[in-house]
Amino acid sequence: MQDVLLQVQAVSKSYHDGDVTTQVLTEVDLQVFKGEQLAIVGTSGSGKSTLLHIMGTLDKPSAGKVLLAGEDLYQVSSARQAQIRNQDLGFIYQFHHLLPEFSALENVAMPAFIQGRDRTQAQADAKVLLERVGLGHRMSHIPAELSGGERQRVAIARALINKPKLVLADEPTGNLDAKSGEAVYELIRELANQLGTAFVVVTHDPKLAARMDRQLTMKNGYLQAVAEHAQ
């Protein structure tokens, strides 16, 4: 029996603008298992990114619960939420959000610095991760000196520096060409298998999503279909 890492229970989300209410998510239920690679596919505006943000405590649900390792993420203090984001969750975005004035090594180590870890050890861990993502020769380069695919690899390494239980990736290949995007997905699969980290990846590309262990389809705020894939 698989161990459940994250549970989304009857989560709904709506936005209000005067008399107008926009329903984005409707009673979404979801389980993410330890170490699995889960893809959520859907068209733009289907609610998939909103769900990912709620899973990562970046947006509050209008109703429902989100539990990570049994802890209700919306029944804890904002300080505890920040601690969870830094220690237990990793984030990868379509646009890498690397700090432009810092090297690849410093960008990867930054979450560990924020956590208060020893700087020498944090940089040593960052070096190992950069080597693991194939950038051992680019550690001293700033983002402007890296290609789009290389910058996204740095972002993946940064997401893993604090050894999170779960990494949430929002369109991680959306800003890359097909070849670079495919390489990023292969890297995610490889790292998930090596490190035992769970990944939830939001994408509009069903071909890339099909590489993951499991696939859910989001349509009009509902999770509609599940497809199983060979390992």
From Swiss-Prot:
Localization recorded for this chain is: Cell inner membrane
Q: Name one GO molecular function term.
A: transmembrane transporter activity
Keyword annotations from UniProtKB, A to Z: ATP-binding, Cell inner membrane, Cell membrane, Membrane, Nucleotide-binding, Translocase, Transport
For this protein, the record's PROSITE patterns field holds:
ABC_TRANSPORTER_1 (PS00211), ABC_TRANSPORTER_2 (PS50893), LOLD (PS51244)
- Taking every annotated instance into account, which residue ranges of this chain make up the domain ABC transporter? 6-231
Per the record, the similarity remark reads:
Belongs to the ABC transporter superfamily. Lipoprotein translocase (TC 3.A.1.125) family.
Q: Where is the major localization of this protein? A: membrane
Gene3D superfamilies, A to Z = P-loop containing nucleotide triphosphate hydrolases
Q: Identify the enzyme class.
A: translocase
Outline what the protein does: Part of the ABC transporter complex LolCDE involved in the translocation of mature outer membrane-directed lipoproteins, from the inner membrane to the periplasmic chaperone, LolA. Responsible for the formation of the LolA-lipoprotein complex in an ATP-dependent manner.
What protein does this entry describe? Lipoprotein-releasing system ATP-binding protein LolD
Report residues binding ATP: 42-49
Q: How is this protein positioned relative to the membrane?
A: Peripheral membrane protein
What is annotated about its quaternary structure and interactions?
The complex is composed of two ATP-binding proteins (LolD) and two transmembrane proteins (LolC and LolE).
Q: Which Pfam families match?
A: ABC_tran
**Coiled coil located at which positions?**
none
| EC identifiers of the protein | 7.6.2.-
Biological process GO annotation list? lipoprotein localization to outer membrane; protein localization to outer membrane
GO CC annotations on file: plasma membrane
User: SUPFAM superfamilies from the xrefs?
Assistant: P-loop containing nucleoside triphosphate hydrolases
Cross-referenced PANTHER family: IMPORT ATP-BINDING PROTEIN, LIPOPROTEIN-RELEASING SYSTEM ATP-BINDING PROTEIN LOLD
